[in-house]
Amino acid sequence: VAAKKRPLSSMTPTLVLKDGKPTLVTGSPGGARIITTVLQTVVNTIDFGMNPAEAASTPRIHHQWLPDELRVEKGLSPDTLAILQKQGYKVSVKPTMGRTQTIQLRDDGLYGYSDPRNPDGQTLGY
């Protein structure tokens, strides 16, 4: 932090629309892993048809410039880890990464999920 400097921020509050109407609202607190956490939640929901609980519960993957390592969350399959290492990635397994709060809006109601990685979190909608 210094005068005339902008703080680094990865804030990514996300609203996904379909035909102009909201279908998914999600976000994540934290730092550098916000963008990949939110992206993986959106991809899991839209592309893989997961509900918010399933989308949040899958193991996460993150890479940034420094440190030059691929961080993966515990629970990623050993086969996948072996493939990544064979491709030359320096893989670092972490117990947890990122947290989300997500609400999915469907025709039959609202489905919210508070990521269990944050035991104090709540997902609220009205």
What does each model-identified segment do?
Residues 75-126:
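Cofactor-centric catalytic regions
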